[in-house]
Amino acid sequence: MSLPTADAPALLSVRGLEVTFGENPEPVLHSVSFDIRPGERVAIVGQSGSGKSTIIGSILRLLPGDGHITGGSILLDGEDLSRASEQRMRSIRGRRIALVPQDPASNLNPSMRVGAQIADALAASGSRSKAEIDRRVLELMTEAGIPEAERRAKQYPHEFSGGMRQRVLIAIALSREPELLIADEPTSALDVTVQRQILNHLQTLVDAHGTSLLFITHDLGVAADRTDRIIVMSEGRIVEVGTPAEILLSPQEEYTKRLVAAAPTAVAAVRVASASSAVKPGPILEVSHLVKEFKIRGQRGSILKAVDDVSFSVERGTTTAIVGESGSGKTTVARIILGLESATSGTALVDGEGITSSRGRQRRALRRRVQPVFQDPYGSLDPTYSIEKLIDEPLRIFKVGDRRSRQERVAELLDQVALPRTVAQRRPNELSGGQRQRVAIARALALHPELLICDEAVSALDVLVQEQILTLLADLQTELGLSYLFITHDLAVVRQIAHNVVVMKRGRVMEQGATNTVFESPSSDYTRELLSAIPGASLVG
């Protein structure tokens, strides 16, 4: 690819941008300035609250609530968007500047077929016949990596996985061939191989059409692999700007150094916890020949084997990770172990007792020993409850102790997850994402479980917060002798925390073994493909 020349006129030029919300005179963006040239790929990297999304809202003139631009300019080919009318902005959004948003669930119409939603975006240009639109819909879906496009165009968003819904959003954004594509964490929820396909497609678009790309991400590896320049932000200010090699290999600012140090990579030194010496040897979990079949709605007699003859074990005091793409069956395995799904055949034993065959009192007892930590703490924590009520809810359900002893247990748990006891009377929306995940971990620990099932427990967190949560989990494992089954699509995280790894694809185990062995000498082509797709390894390896 030929990089844009340094003296090429900027397509987008942001100068001295300041944004405030409400009557608060303190800006949330402080004199932000940068350029994007035609065909250039620029990443903005930073934690939540750094101002990345506010920049997007400013460029598109879609700032939430009472946010408004109080200083600076945003020039698109010389036209100042900060002063453009709403009517003018409507002609620019989608046609000249398009957005791939982060959350497909809230950006697709649940009552409208997917193909029709892409067709709507195409029809907005007003220059195509229905036959041309129908043909282009299928082309866009195929380019975005959606198989069986003709059949799937007739389906609704809820019939797509999260990754597939994200591909639909990308197809919509690319439908009108914009000059500038703003991608807001477009692949953060996707598996590495799917991520690579999507990013390859975006790169092809840039090369073929000279489209500029503004990539918003917290993943330094993705930014390094896929962009020409990285802008590092913190607290509404630009901290550092440089090429990927400059930022990753020789960062100048302290904040950038912390970001680089916290970013997990496939080649990072393994930092798994050592279990307490008091932990007795042997497996806490044994899964043998597990099978789960689902009937496919609308296809008489058709069966989907979501889990197909899966066997593995988790030793006490260790971490086993299950990795795989969307649809690999890893979450279904976790749901069976948690007793949330029944198995078609096979067994899952916790300390020799059958989860799949247990009923009534025995199942309740097993559930005390196995607890989940989910991906989205905001979605899994009742927003009307105080933190104290959320953490002591399992104790109340299982009738453990009196009110005073439960309060003492909540205080002890807050100490264990490094939260101040003062948060007990606050509510989830008053906490950061990392703090909410600590509350979810405290809640999971309330009943003294032996095994935690962590389902994408850190995938929604920024790298600095992610590192803190992974360190906390490792410390708790050492202190309490906990065992973890870690469900994830992030192999770089697996390298950091897991003693053993199980690689799944389409319901089957492709490979399993010690993490070091699987990463350094993979025996499966699929594992090698997953490892080669991890972003950033070429620069930090």
Regions found by a protein language model. Give the residues of each.
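Conserved catalytic motifs of ABC-family nucleotide-binding domains
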Residues: E177, H448
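Conserved ABC ATPase signature
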Residues: Q155-F160, M164, R427-L431, Q435
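Conserved ABC transporter NBD signature motif
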Residues: H68-D80, G346-G354, L366
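Helix-to-loop junction immediately C-terminal to a conserved catalytic motif
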Residues: L60, P64, L338
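ABC ATPase "signature
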Residues: V241-G242, S250, Q512-G513, S521
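Conserved ABC ATPase "signature" region
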Residues: D80, E132-R151, S405-T422, L531-S532
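ABC ATPase C-loop
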Residues: V168, A173-L174, L445
